[in-house]
């Protein structure tokens, strides 16, 4: 099976049938390597999908430079909690992109209760620069002292909803993610009037309030992630074993001389 071909077709179907707008990668928690990002870029481009990359910090200039080289369509700054962090992100983007920054999405990850408390000021600082926010429920719930198993419950919903309402009022694209699975469907349907998108770990989807559609879309998005992980595993396994026969021959050759 040609995994790359299978993945390309899978991505085309995600876009055509399920309203997927982009695929995600991370320099941050996921720690994507450059060769992985090049591989991902080669997979998403034929499908006509965007590539959104989460950088390692609000002013991770090296990561932003890599995003530019990879022709990322969006850059996300993680763990933004203050207006000053937005300013740092803005300055870093301007340093690398200059006038061309208008061609990419500039997104912040709203993922702590501290960010929530400072969100009005964050929006003021980001006016004219930011294009969207993504509420990260996993870290958000942890910062609220809520266990991950309760991520779908009302307390997390209320904060996520308020984040998204304020973002949309400010003219930004509102998105949320964090441990998204089929069990998240009631949460997605309930918050649908206040969001534009939602995301799994690897896929950004257009919102819907149709439970059957959402179930198919989420499962198909998770299947893409599984296929991609298999491709990564295959790639690194091949790298790890490509010299194994040469190693065996050299060991035999050296040992025969020593004897």
Task: Locate the predicted segments by residue.
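Expand to "…catalyze enediolate/carbanion chemistry for C-C bond making/breaking, isomerization
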Residues: 1-259
């Amino acid at each position: 099976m040609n995994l790359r071909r299978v993945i390309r077709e899978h991505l085309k179907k995600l876009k055509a049938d399920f309203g997927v707008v982009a695929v995600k990668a991370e320099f941050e928690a996921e720690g994507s390597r450059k060769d992985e990002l090049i591989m991902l870029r080669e997979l998403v481009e034929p499908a006509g999908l965007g590539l959104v990359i989460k950088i390692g910090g609000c002013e991770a200039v090296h990561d932003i430079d890599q995003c530019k080289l990879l022709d990322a369509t969006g850059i996300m700054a993680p763990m933004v909690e203050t207006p000053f962090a937005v300013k740092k992100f803005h300055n870093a983007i301007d340093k690398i992109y200059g006038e061309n920054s208008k061609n990419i999405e500039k997104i912040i990850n709203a993922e702590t209760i501290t960010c929530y408390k400072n969100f009005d000021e964050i929006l003021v600082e980001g006016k004219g620069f930011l294009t969207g926010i993504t509420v990260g429920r996993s870290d958000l719930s942890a910062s609220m002292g809520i266990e991950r198993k309760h991520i779908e419950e009302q307390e997390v919903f209320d904060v996520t909803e308020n984040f998204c309402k304020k973002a949309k009022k400010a003219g930004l694209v509102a998105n949320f993610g964090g441990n998204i699975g089929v069990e998240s469907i009631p949460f997605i349907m309930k918050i649908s009037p206040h969001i534009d998108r939602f995301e799994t770990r690897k896929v950004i989807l257009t919102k819907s309030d149709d439970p059957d559609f959402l179930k198919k879309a989420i499962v198909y998005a998770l299947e893409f992630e599984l296929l991609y992980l298999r491709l990564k595993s295959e790639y690194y396994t091949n790298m790890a074993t490509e010299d194994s026969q040469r190693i065996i021959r050299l060991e035999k050759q050296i040992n025969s001389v020593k004897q």
